[in-house]
Amino acid sequence: MCSRVWFITDRRISQEYPQIQILRALKERCVEDDVEFRYLLMDEIVLTITDGQLGLRVGQEIVTSYPQVAVVRVPTPWVQSDSDITVLRHLEKMGCRLVNRPQAILNCVNKFWTFQELAGHGVPLPDTYSYGGHDNFRKMIDEAEPLGYPVVVKNARGHRGKAVFLARDKHHLSDLCHLIRHEAPYLFQEYVKESHGRDVRVVLVGGRVIGSMLRCSTDGRMQSNCSLGGVGMMCPLSEQGKQLAVQVCNILGMDVCGIDLLQKNDGSFVVCEANANVGFIAFDQACGMDVAGIVADFVLSLLPSRLSRKMSLLSVVSSTSETSSEPEVCIPTEVIIPSEVCIPNEICPLGTTCPIPDAMSTMSTSSTSSESEADLTETGPTPVGANPAYNINSLLASEMKLLTE
């Protein structure tokens, strides 16, 4: 049976960095492994049910060869269950393994839905309130008082750090009520003061942490999104942080995701957000990684032919280990931190001094802490902080030391 992989994305984000890089990597891997590949935009697909059987058309073409695995990149804040999710459900019902699955995407479309899924699993979360009804923001001004002030206010479908506010007091909340748009509900969330202006973005592929990046605001604002002028730096993550990110990923059922963590003074973490359509332009640059290539390798590993091969290899290894008397030897691989992502003129976590005079000044902006890293056209030079004495290199060094203690 011929192996087939599809890449499906939304026309609105098809020309952005993550989609372009995943398309490149998938094409390369499929050519190397003799896998049939097809690239489609969501609005090109026509769903059919004929003679009681599910089918697909692309334009006037009746599709007869379906993929075993399909990578999906949709702008999660704008996902519509009556259109986008319907297409993905159709493919899933036809036996296609989706990365990510429809339910995993839905779990991250709305920030409160994400917390609903995580609640009850022992995941540390900031106390959060929301509301039903179309426009009950004003009523929540009184209802959310137990959270204290200042309080974080977020649009449930916000993205890229937008529609996020820090309300100083009740009067400030009343002012916000007149300014915000009410298409989606808002969250009222406990303010984690210790993590103001910084968070840790953890990227996972196939349920495994592939890297982590410390993000810091450069202008004193609460959000640390690189798309808003924040800067990112590769940083090692404690075992507790890794385990928490993996736990969140598994609960939400995601294959590829970004988990944003806030850190308290005692070194513990709380979950800020989860991103099913994680962007990785700044992550690639900060960590010296090719996330798209890692995603492509994972996707091809899901093909039935690969899974069968893995089972055969496991069988051989198992029988060999039972008959062999030789002890297994694990050879540790050398950990290399690229010099271009080290902290300039400071001490790296591994104890070496970085020679680069100002690596952080070359960092590009990344997308969002929230769902999708849409609209890379907004990326630009990092704004200069309001305080001229603000030293981002010193801040990053101290934060990385805190994270690894």
Curated annotation (Swiss-Prot):
Amino acids binding Mg(2+) 1: 260, 273
Disordered as annotated region, ranges: 359-387
UniProt xrefs under Gene3D superfamilies: 3.40.50.20, ATP-grasp fold, A domain (3.30.1490.20), ATP-grasp fold, B domain (3.30.470.20)
Record GO biological process: protein modification process
Keywords from the named record: ATP-binding, Cytoplasm, Ligase, Magnesium, Manganese, Metal-binding, Nucleotide-binding
Residues covered by the ATP-grasp domain: 115-300
Cofactor(s) needed by this chain: Mg(2+); Mn(2+)
Bias (Low complexity): 360-371
Domain of life: Eukaryota
Family: Belongs to the RimK family.
Further details from the record: N-acetyl-L-aspartyl-L-glutamate (NAAG) is the most abundant dipeptide present in vertebrate central nervous system (CNS). Beta-citryl-L-glutamate, a structural analog of NAAG, is present in testis and immature brain.
Protein's name according to its UniProt entry: Beta-citrylglutamate synthase B
Organism for this UniProt entry: Danio rerio (Zebrafish)
Native organism taxonomy: Eukaryota, Metazoa, Chordata, Craniata, Vertebrata
